[in-house]
Amino acid sequence: MKFKVNGHEVFASTGGRPFDKKKPLIIFVHGSGLTHMTWVLQTRYFAFHGYNSLAVDLPGHGLSSGESLKSIEEMADWVSDVIDAVGHKEASLVGHSQGCLVTVECTSRYPSKIKTLSLMGGAGAIPVSYTHLRAHETRI
């Protein structure tokens, strides 16, 4: 599924089911340098069990356009904008690794928009190596 957020195209895997605004929304947020592919099995499961399941590619990742966002706060605001862009008032969030930091921040900033929060493989903020950043920037 493709849609626009802040003028940039966003790609989100729907788990093999069409998006239906009547169904509750779950947004899956991947870790640093990863993509929607992190969530292949999870999105499919929830899509086939009554949910709108969106595994988004953050800007500058995977099939989404735009520059990579520079802070957890920017990413959290972007996730809130995704909820608006797909026409929902609230969503459940699932984060992995850096996606945990993003979803926690989003929940803190927009509590009325977040129904539930699930975290997998999260950690506190850690320094990122130059090699990791360079590989992401050049998409090696």
Feature names for model-found ranges:
Residues E90-P127:
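Conserved hydrolase catalytic core segment
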Residues F11-L63:
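Conserved HGGG/HGGXW glycine-rich cap/lid loop of the alpha/beta-hydrolase fold
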Residues S13, F48, N52-V94:
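Active-site loop/oxyanion-hole signature of alpha/beta-hydrolase fold enzymes
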Residues T38-V40, S64-L69, V128-Y130:
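Conserved catalytic-core motifs of eukaryotic protein kinase domains, centered on the activation segment
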Residues M1-E9:
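N-terminal cap/lid segment of alpha/beta-hydrolase-fold proteins
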Residues T131-I140:
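Conserved small/polar residues in nucleotide/adenosyl-binding loops
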Residues L34, G60, C100, G124-A125, ...:
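Active-site micro-motifs of SAM-dependent methyltransferase domains
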